[in-house]
Amino acid sequence: MSVRSAEYPRPKHFLVHLSDTHLVAQGELYDAVDASTRLREVLSGIVASGARPDALIFTGDLTDQGHPDAYAELKAIVEPVAAEIDAQVIWAMGNHDDRSTFRSLLLGEDATDHPVDNVYDLDGLRVITLDSSVPGHHYGEISDRQLDWLRSELAVPAPDGTILALHHPPVPCIQDLAVLVELRDQSRLADVLRGSDVRAILAGHLHYSTTATFAGIPVSVASSTCYTQDLNVEVGGQRGRDGAQGCNLVHVYDETIVHSVVPLGAHVTVGEPVDADEGARRLSAAGIRILESEKAGRSIV
């Protein structure tokens, strides 16, 4: 029997994209949602799947009011999971976050109110977090100084390209009220990104999953882990709901990046369940193999 290789090898990099955890210091979020429990449920699903991402990337609104106790609980929930699956944690600021508390408690840095912009190297894949928050407001904006910094960072391409992570997505708002809190002056950001090695933009803020392109770059918005927006609401209206939470899987290949939505919750099994061993047996029986990517470092599961 001849052996055929699958059209694509395994991904070079694997990330999990989470957003809008909105943890509170005590009680339930808006007296309706246990945000901590929802986050634990999402992370438990990742661990149970056997997935081993390079990084967990959180795109802002990590707490609802920027309270130190909420950040402490966030670390207590996320860091043990990250250690268990050997994943780096990458935090980005959101409009509900507090810069000084974010810096001191999550990054271990001096508490300042300067924008929280950082660069991470994941075995050749560059991840840049860009702070789109405006203290005291819920809309997003990126300053001239930040844009100059970003342009400088992007001047030298990374071996496997760059992923930009920020809270406010540079996409059209399909809910009218969301225009109040959109990212402003987006064309200035587009001018910096156009022609760069940025391969994908990860964002949150909207509390529903969506995709678009910006300056020719794919944009992937992750739903919230705490509550989401009902997109079947009356046109022109808005309604949050305790449902449809989740995260996104981001598989990075040489020529493309795949973003996949993972909804929270267990559902009735349809058809025959197949475990990993049986899946491998069937591929072998069919004479198909999936090649490993040419990556120096950890293997992708």
UniProtKB/Swiss-Prot annotation:
Its cofactor is Fe(2+). It comes from Rhodococcus erythropolis (strain PR4 / NBRC 100887). Fe cation 1 binds at residues 20, 22, 61, 207. Its EC number is 3.1.4.-. This is Probable cyclic nucleotide phosphodiesterase RER_40650. Keywords: Hydrolase, Iron, Metal-binding, Nucleotide-binding. Binds 2 Fe(2+) ions per subunit. Gene3D superfamilies: 3.60.21.10. GO terms for molecular function: 3',5'-cyclic-AMP phosphodiesterase activity; metal ion binding; nucleotide binding. AMP binds at residues 22, 61, 95-96, 207. Belongs to the cyclic nucleotide phosphodiesterase class-III family. PANTHER family: CYCLIC NUCLEOTIDE PHOSPHODIESTERASE CBUA0032-RELATED, PHOSPHOHYDROLASE. It holds the Pfam family Metallophos. Fe cation 2 binds at residues 61, 95, 167, 205.
